[in-house]
Amino acid sequence: MWAWCLMPNHVHLIVVPADTDGLRRALAGVHRRYAGIIHARRRRTGHFWQGRFGAVAMDEAHLAAALRDVSLNPARARLVVRAPDWRWSSTRAHLTGKDDGITGRAPIRERFPGFAQLLAAQPDADAFARLRAAESIGRPLGDDRFLARIERATKRRLTPRKRGPKPRTEADANDEGQLSVLSP
């Protein structure tokens, strides 16, 4: 787990699963156990987390925006004045370099050796908006090369297609008005 933040009504995670089913396997069990504990304490049932589970595959360029979002979320929500003061987050581990038993610090340290400067930098509103949009529609976030690589790996088209009806082809025009007869 590269980064995380447990908020009162939701959780943010930046994880890189080892295989295609790794994320589901890891989170399903955690969700069941944690929700079960809280429901038992509060003697309630029903949905536990706010909204649905959202996941965004992203390239390295968008990782910085995601890290800022996850790390600064408690301060933006006015739960603390400074993000490192929030106990239920990986932010402190990344800033101090101390092991918290949860956070994989090395991948972030390698990519962002100036983690404090990353958090202090002016927020990129466009990157944040792209991150939220990608999360809401479930599409990967990255440049054309990244998207092409993901499309090849998954054998699925991931880039949005043009809206509206498909353009007519010459074959469609030739078929128009012809009646097909099937005989037994």
Each predicted region: which residue ranges?
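Short Pro-Cys-Gly-centered "Cys-loop" motif that presents a nucleophilic cysteine in a tight turn
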Residues: 1-7, 16-184
